[in-house]
Amino acid sequence: MDDTQHFCLRWNNYQSSITSAFENLRDDEAFVDVTLACEGRSIKAHRVVLSACSPYFRELLKSTPCKHPVILLQDVNFMDLHALVEFIYHGEVNVHQKSLQSFLKTAEVLRVSGLTQQQAEDTHSHLAQIQNLANSGGRTPLNTHTQSLPHPHHGSLHDDGGSSTLFSRQGAGSPPPTAVPSLPSHINNQLLKRMAMMHRSSAAAAAEETSHAFKRLRGSDNSLPLSGAVGSGSNNNSPDLPPLHARSASPQQTPADFSTIKHHNNNNTPPLKEEKRNGPTGNGNSGNGNGNGNGASNGNGISISDKLGSLTPSPLARAGADDVKSEPMDMVCSNNNANANDEHSNDSTGEHDANRSSSGDGGKGSLSSGNDEEIGDGLASHHAAPQFIMSPAENKMFHAAAFNFPNIDPSALLGLNTQLQQSGDLAVSPQGKLTTNATTTTTTINNSITNNNNNNNNNNYDYSLPTKNSNSQKTPSPTTTTLTTPTTTTPTRPTAITSASGICGLNLSTFAANGSSSGGSNGGLSMTALLPQQQQQQQQQHQMSQQQQQQQQQQQQQGNSSSGQQQQPNGILACSTPKANTPTTTQQQMYAAVMAAAASASASTSGSANSSLNNSNSTLNTSGGLNNSASGGDDFRCNPCNKNLSSLTRLKRHIQNVHMRPTKEPVCNICKRVYSSLNSLRNHKSIYHRNLKQPKQEPGVGATQAAANSFYHQQHQQQQLNHHSSS
């Protein structure tokens, strides 16, 4: 006996726990693997649940290989879809009377179990058996019927026990009526509920006595569909049921809407304030007072209208307000009445009741999902289109406000030129670069100043450039032009010449004062300074004094052969050429002419004048200030090639390497290396052959080179001598 003994372990609240678990998973969006979308909104669900409750979804999801498909349903109202999903997960749903017809049509299309004609036909035999038991039992206690009921297992997740026991509660104390024929499968469950609401007053006491028996019936036979609610609801103690059956005996192909006469009114009528204030006590026309669909009765059989009194009028009294639609939460919330905990079966747990509660204490409602806020806010009427998230006025990315720049003041911009003119100064960098702070202004030149000084013993020289053609002498005429003027009132051109003279070690002031505008063939150097008219006289006097000082300084430099360096009056360290290694006067004139051009360029760049160097064979225009004023006044232009250089040192180096390049390549006479320029050769010797004595050149070779190109040969010798003296 011990070997054959087995124990049966039963989970009493298994069905309610399973359904509650699925509800909680969907509310938390856990393990959801399918999305239903319509009208631009979506609902997430589980494939297993949809497939178990709808053959349509079962076939569709079988043929879909996607892990998380999105099913777009055309011509389906979102509220109907939301109600269907809630029905699938909960087994019941509260639907407004005006939405009932479209809801049933959507359920028919999606073939939801419990809401279709096929489901009613499958359960017709069970309903007939229940009716026979009810007719033969008379006033027999209902728990006997519960024990004899079959238990089909066709997998329907909805719980229609409340619907099945709806009419038995109300007619328990009534006299037994005549025999009722078998109900056709197309009986509308909503019609039966509505008619039962009309007789709820007489059935309240009897339903209270048998409430526990009905709960047991509901727990043992959860799989009965909604359309089969007539079975347990056909308690023949109700005197008005035969007319109902005769009234609905004619077959109907589509679910009918059994609302009152005013159900054809506008469906978009907003809900009344009184109906909002009443809360989720019932949706009026359908008579579903709580989430279990038990008509106007809660779990213990007490009518909601009896409990609430005048707060919730009966459906007959509210016939004039049938066109008014309740809030969406009135249709979906179930447990906001006073005895919400009593509406579940005895097998239900407290956790299950808390999860199904939709009160304001934070518990999850039976229809709680990610779209509840959209349903409550965007659906004032059932068929209204979803509202815009933002109004057109709020949908602008930027406001029509002007952008202000407080740091830019037009008056300050207008006065910038004058301020810079007053605050500029002339500075000489340690590398010999002349830097100025100048602005561009337009000045009308009316006069040209020609400085003539014939007291220089070096007034004649021979200088030509291979890149310039022979032109006649030119004297600049008074024109209106744009030049760069210094911001200081002191003349700067003699200072620039003095600076250049200190850098080169030569007296360049002789070329600035040599010649006249009609110089002729004597090779005089004509310089015309274009200055403002108010400074011309002061410039002329200062230039004369500077020229005399430079002549005396040159004589002192030539007489002092022992000193390698001396300090100039302008504060620039100048390198003087040793007397012993000084070449002929012709070579010095050639080199001085080049440096005079560089000095004139620096002087004109600093904004003091527009200088022109003219002789019989070439014209050297060094008016760098005119053409370079737009670049900031820091460029030094080489006129033969029109190249701008940033400093005077670079301009000098450029003239030496490019325009004074000898015909023979610069070759180191010690290591015989060939370089691209004299500057590179000089750097090479200063690094590698600094301590070596320079070898003497052959006289014949030097004479040949001098005869071929005396200027370049002498310049090359000058570079070598300068390097030797510095080393």
Curated annotation (Swiss-Prot):
Q: Which SMART domains match?
A: BTB, ZnF_C2H2
Stretches the record annotates as Disordered: 135-185, 218-378, 445-496, 532-583, 604-626, 694-727
InterPro entries tied to this protein: BTB/POZ_dom (IPR000210), Dros_DevTransReg (IPR051095), SKP1/BTB/POZ_sf (IPR011333), Znf_C2H2_sf (IPR036236), Znf_C2H2_type (IPR013087)
GO cellular component, as recorded: nucleus
Regions of biased composition (Polar residues) lie at 135-149
Instruction: Give the induction annotation.
Output: Primary response to 20-hydroxyecdysone in third instar larval imaginal disks.
From the Swiss-Prot or TrEMBL record, what is one GO molecular function term?
RNA polymerase II transcription regulatory region sequence-specific DNA binding
| Compositional bias segments (type: Gly residues) | 281-298
Q: Where in the cell is it found?
A: Nucleus
Principal localisation: nucleus
The record ties this protein, via PROSITE patterns, to:
BTB, ZINC_FINGER_C2H2_1, ZINC_FINGER_C2H2_2
Ranges of residues in domain BTB? 32-97
**Where is there biased composition of kind Low complexity?**
227-238, 445-460, 475-495, 533-568, 713-727
ZnF segments: C2H2-type: 636-659, 666-689
Q: Where is the composition biased (Basic and acidic residues)?
A: 341-355
GO terms (BP aspect): autophagy; cellular response to ecdysone; compound eye photoreceptor fate commitment; dendrite morphogenesis; eclosion; follicle cell of egg chamber development; gravitaxis; male genitalia morphogenesis
Q: Which UniProt keywords apply?
A: Developmental protein, DNA-binding, Metal-binding, Nucleus, Repeat, Zinc, Zinc-finger
Role: Broad-complex proteins are required for puffing and transcription of salivary gland late genes during metamorphosis.
Q: What is this protein called?
A: Broad-complex core protein isoforms 1/2/3/4/5
